[in-house]
Amino acid sequence: MSTFGAEVDQVWPAVTGDSPHLTNFGRKLLKDCRQVQKPIGGYENLGNVIKLSAEFPLEFGVNSVKVYRQSPSRLARINEEVASAYPLIHERTLGLYLQYLEHKCRWGNAVEKPIYRNLSLCGFVQRLLVKRCASFFARNDKYLLVSGESGASGFEAVGTREEKAPLVLANVLSYDDIKLSALLSVSSRTEFVNEGERTNCGHVDLNTKTLERHGVIVGMIGARLSRRNLMEFQDIVIARQQNTRERGYGMALDEPATTRDEDYRRLWREFYATRDLIHGQAVIDNQRFGPSKNKMDVFDNLVMKRRYAISFDMLLLEAEARAKRVKKLAYIHVVGFGLGVWKAAEQQERIFMETFEQRMRTLGNRLNNVGLVHFSWFSITHCGGLSNGSLIEIPGHPKDGIRVLISKRNPARKLSDPEHAGMLLVVSYAWDGNALPGNEFWMKMLQSTGDSSTACSTLVAELHNPYINTKFCNGGNLHIASPEHGVLHIAEYAKRVIRSESDAL
């Protein structure tokens, strides 16, 4: 039983039968995805990346992570790593994206409708990839655009008549977009330049006895709860000025919307499969409703758990798919994405770990190639069935279950223990929904976050960059993580969900 009671302890999402409910609008967009061509890798991958990297308008934080600076002995493998990159979303997020596009086409203002009305699903994902800033951080939204323009604040007006250049919807993401972008990951194989410690600054480590030379890298984005009335704060924190009927809160799950605000809240109620509340309806009970750092707010532990569940499913299913392709067991390095400066409640770390354990058990026999999950830099050392060295037992698993470690480790430290030899290292890192991989890296702030230190220790600054790895890190290469179907390219997923060409629109 969860620390937070039976309601929070419910298993969600379901493993089967949870494919998105499609309106006529969404069905048409998903049907169109069946024609999307998955890009094919070739010998020219490397040359294209090197050429486009040289043309990229911003200076890199360090050059040691560029493909052209890698050892010639690594280049054949890097050519394959370039082609291994793709954007990834959970299948519930796919349904949300389709509903969001329909919402903007119906309820959007004069600024929004011209942007969204002609977008395909893959076109929308491409927008989320290429319209983001290079850097975007701090409470005042300090930013650096790919164009080189920089400043702070102004994003709340994007997509309204009050927007001002350069922060206009045609060129950048609105806060509504960023909230959806936070549910998008990019994954690839990569070389590791060093162990990835926070202060690595791109130094080249040639010691193969301490460094895992290559593995998988996945950018994961936590809930940004540090900005009131924006992002996931809208769903997870119940606040007096935010949670009002006028803003669309408090409606039943199936209640039809009659205003733009009501329809926007409908999207998120359906995504999280729970109603939202008006401030005053929720009383702190340390079960579903917990305290928040702001004593006037109430923290919804259930919705926080569901936000985590979507991310954890993605990471676990992606690690499984990557490991299965190479016939290995995955060693997953997990960091507490969203548990730093974005955190709004002390109980979040415990919710994080309880949810991760439940998703491992729930996905269970779909994770036969996941061998170990290593929680790194967590303050909690015991949580439910999770402790250093514990085994999450899974009937039929080739290793009887998934081993758990909880200790501090550098992301790319050598898997030197005999029982870990031959495993595939899958590293998660805390990314941002409105920044290129590395974020502060592009402002030469190399030691500020795990995001920038990851860009200094892997090839993500090029491989996960939609301006540089244009063929593979793009919306047309979208992959869907489905608990029922595994990880599939969007075209294959669409064909499975929409069974035949003759299905009615």
UniProtKB/Swiss-Prot annotation:
- Record's keyword annotation contains Metal-binding: no
Is rRNA-binding given among the entry's keywords?
no
Instruction: Kindly list the cysteine pairs connected by disulfide bridges.
Output: none
Main EC class the enzyme belongs to? hydrolase
List keywords of the entry alphabetically. Answer: Hydrolase
Per the UniProt entry, the Enzyme Commission number(s) are: 3.2.2.19
The entry's protein name is: ADP-ribosylarginine hydrolase CG2909
Q: Which organism is it from?
A: Drosophila melanogaster (Fruit fly)
